Curated annotation (Swiss-Prot):
SUPFAM superfamilies: FAD-linked reductases, C-terminal domain, FAD/NAD(P)-binding domain. It comes from Agaricus campestris (Field mushroom). InterPro entries: FAD/NAD-bd_sf (IPR036188), GMC_OxRdtase (IPR012132), GMC_OxRdtase_N (IPR000172), GMC_OxRtase_C (IPR007867). This is Pyranose dehydrogenase. The modification Tele-8alpha-FAD histidine is found at residue 123. The gene is pdh1. Catalyzes the single-oxidation or sequential double oxidation reaction of carbohydrates primarily at carbon-2 and/or carbon-3 with the concomitant reduction of the flavin. Accepts only a narrow range of electron acceptors such as substituted benzoquinones and complexed metal ions and reacts extremely slowly with O(2) as acceptor. Residues 1-21 form the signal peptide. The active site is at residues 530, 574.
Length: 595
């Protein structure tokens, strides 16, 4: 007997209209045998659910999404903004590990990626940043696709958004520029903030050190440099907004979602026509196949998508041969060009009030009223985007342009509690007993020029691939991160902070020279988990790259890729918003090709 299917519906009594939504299936055996799917989306993450939802707006098309993880509705913590930090390393995480990183003293880094419906939009820190105008214009130049230029993509980014005040109904005046935001989209975005004294000190610093830390009203206007209020993908009800909640839940019942099932390969239906998806529940289970009438859209993310392509015989011929995979399309660019951000955590001793709270009590409060400390994205609510002066750059400018930042400061909390050493990507920090209350934030090199790779470990689709970030592989990357630490120290040495900050704890205050700071960074740098580029988009007839400007995999028909892997380089910001924008744009491109 088939397992229970979740057909979610609501009946509007007036007019007797029935509003149906996507149908979910827990096991491949539950799939209906009488449905031919026009499109099969391999991966139900941030991009995959956007594409499935948009294609599903055509009621004549049947769409199937195959997702390796469970439903987001099964995991309470994915709903609560303040519980985001509990999700990495949990059962809804792929729990990847990189190969030893040469420039990090041979350390292997944990690499968190979501394995759940909604992907990283269900699992991340919810920060909503578009990147700079320069980023988008650079991508347009690199790919030969002018539709990706800032002026062309901005209407699509605004189309994504449903911007509103947060649960507290605090005015957003002075925190955002309403003219650069959308109000009618699917994805909820808020300028969520808490009233803490730290905010006032930061704003005072923008007046004192205006050249380095100017105040920026809205970081999402395309010119993000400066200190700005954070924006989050949280709805007015203080719940996380993700591609699962914002897109899938408003989708018709012509969209089917198969959960807990791994896509193993894309199989050719002809010599270069790849429209058949192979999938299985586990490594020992039977492999099943379904063929899309029109196309397969691969949306596994920047690690899983190249792994699936390589297991399908699309990749570097010599590398595939080495692991026993027959080459069907020889493309050495598959899995190359990993572009990511390097970061380090800094701690400053302070007499400011801490932002700690009783988590159990906060969960009760959130359950009862959707308010309290767990209703916001973080206890501290600012980001700073720093552009280094030319004299502080080591070599050529790695940013996308003159209006783009090199460094990000992301503030997290003021606390005596510091992350344990087993937190993903984390390294040993000062012992709890050796410090008091500390201001905690990340210093991020936004423009790493080092490039890494994702490659097959073997020909078992259920094995983790080899992930080499080549973190700090170029000297310029560590030089910029070092300048970021210097900049952070200047900020917290300002007149505004002097009465409240007693110096740097991590790195220790006695580490001041460039040489000593570099040694510190080699042992403490981690990934900021914003990897892109493994299946990079490139011009139509380019000799490099994996997908054309229409997202089709070069050398194939019937197969496109839509996710972070196609973005050529990491933006000067977080990657969530660009992935939404790429997915919305791809949906338009795909639909138009069948119009």
């Amino acid at each position: 007997m088939a397992r229970f299917n979740a057909r979610l519906f609501s009946i509007a009594i007036l007019g007797f209209q029935v509003a149906r939504s996507a149908i979910t299936y827990q096991h491949p055996d539950d799939l209906p045998g009488d449905v031919d799917y026009d499109f099969i989306v391999a991966g139900g993450g941030t991009a995959g659910l956007v594409v499935a939802s948009r294609l599903g707006e055509n009621s004549k098309w049947n769409v199937l999404v195959i997702e390796a993880g469970p439903s987001n509705k099964d995991v309470f913590a994915t709903r609560v903004p303040g519980l985001a930090e509990t999700l990495p390393t949990s059962h809804i995480d792929w729990n990847y590990t990189t190969v030893p990183q040469q420039a990090l003293g041979g350390r292997s880094l944990n690499y968190s990626r979501a394995m759940i419906l909604g992907g990283c939009s269900t699992h991340n820190g919810m920060v909503y940043t578009r990147g700079s105008k320069d980023d988008w214009n650079k991508w347009a130049d690199v790919t030969g696709n002018r539709d990706l230029s800032w002026d062309s993509i901005l209407p699509i980014m605004k189309k994504v958004e449903k911007f509103s005040e947060d649960f507290s109904d605090q005015s957003v005046e002075g925190h955002i520029d309403p003219s650069v935001h959308g109000n009618d989209g699917k994805l909820s975005v808020v300028a969520s903030y808490t009233n803490v004294s730290f905010n006032d000190l930061l704003l005072e610093t923008t007046k004192e050190l205006v050249d380095e830390f100017p105040f920026k009203l809205d970081m999402n206007d395309g010119n993000p440099v400066g200190l700005t209020w954070n924006q989050y993908t949280i709805d007015h009800n203080a719940e996380r907004s993700s591609s699962a909640t914002a897109y899938l839940e408003s989708t018709g019942d012509n969209v089917h979602v198969l959960l807990n099932t791994r896509v193993t390969r894309i199989v050719p239906t002809g010599k270069t026509n790849f429209r058949t998806v192979e999938f299985a529940v586990d490594a020992g289970g039977p492999r099943k196949q379904l063929t899309a009438k029109k196309e397969v859209i691969l949306s596994g993310g920047f690690i899983a998508s190249p792994q699936i392509l390589m297991n399908s015989g699309i990749g570097d011929q010599e590398a595939l041969k080495a692991v026993g995979v027959d080459t069907l399309v020889n493309n050495p660019s598959v899995g190359k060009n990993v572009s990511d951000q390097a970061a380090t955590l800094v701690l400053f001793d302070t007499t400011l009030p801490n932002t700690d709270f009783d988590v159990d009590a906060a969960i009760v409060e959130w359950n009862n009223s959707h308010a309290g400390p767990l209703a916001t994205g973080a206890p501290l609510n600012h980001l700073i985007w720093v552009r280094l002066s030319d004299d502080k750059l080591s070599g050529s400018d790695p940013s996308s342009g003159k209006d783009s930042p090199h460094i990000e400061f992301q503030f997290s909390k003021i606390s005596h509690r510091i992350p344990p050493a087993n937190v993903p990507n984390q390294v040993a920090l000062p012992s709890q007993d050796s410090i008091g209350v500390v201001i905690q934030f990340s210093v991020v090199n936004l423009n790493s020029i080092s490039r890494g790779s994702v490659s097959l470990n073997d020909n078992n689709p259920f094995s983790h691939p080899l992930i080499d970030l080549n973190m700090l592989g170029e000297e310029q990357d560590i030089a910029i991160l070092r300048e970021g630490v210097h900049s952070a120290r200047r900020m917290l040495s300002s007149e505004a902070f002097k009465p409240f900050v007693n110096g740097s704890v991590h790195p220790p205050a006695n580490i001041t020279s460039d040489e000593d700071l570099d040694a510190f960074l080699h042992t403490t740098t981690k990934s900021y988990l914003h990897g892109v580029g493994t299946l990079s988009m490139s011009p139509q007839n380019a000799s490099w790259g994996v997908v054309d400007p229409d997202f089709r995999v070069k050398g194939t028909t019937g197969l496109r890729v839509v996710d972070a892997s196609v973005i050529p380089s990491v933006p000067a910001g977080h990657t969530q918003t660009p992935v939404y924008a790429f997915a919305e744009y791809a949906s338009i491109v795909i639909a138009k090709s069948y119009n």
